[in-house]
Amino acid sequence: FDKNGKPMLHFVYPLRTISDDATIGEKIAFYRKKRNLFGNDLANLIGIDRVTMIRYENNQLDCPYDVIIRISEALNVDRHLLMDEYLQFIDYPYSVFIKQRRKELHLRQCDLGEQLGVTRRQIERWEHSVNIIPKEKYHKLKDIHFIP
């Protein structure tokens, strides 16, 4: 009751949050639902089919970097909120990091390529942002302690 003896109503709303270890798919679904959109609505907004969106949200398909960017723009959220560590590495920009780190370690492109099982030309293409480094090669970079 307030000071005049009238009953006061208190509304309690559940605070929707997402865990720090949520998958990319869980993050997409969380922010989509927060914007009151259905999966096919978001799919249409970013130009993909509904089934692909479902597969992203169910973690049945890796969501590419460019799609994460489109999703974040459609949902009006910071793109980093949707990214895992691999996509954050790609966003860094990875090309600058790879070249700088390789030089810090006094490695030639062919030396790094040999450690990763790729050609010198592929390292060069990554360093010039011609190709995006695949997720498995990112993990290999971590395994060989190239990424601190």
Where are the language model's segments positioned?
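A short, Lys/Arg-rich alpha-helix, primarily the initiator
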Residues: G5-K34, D84-E104
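Short basic helix-loop element that most often maps to the first helix and adjoining turn
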Residues: E26-L45, R70, V96-D111, K140
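DNA major-groove recognition helix of helix-turn-helix/homeodomain DNA-binding modules
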Residues: D66-L81, K135-P148
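Helix-turn-helix/homeodomain-like alpha-helical modules used for DNA recognition
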Residues: D91-I132, E136
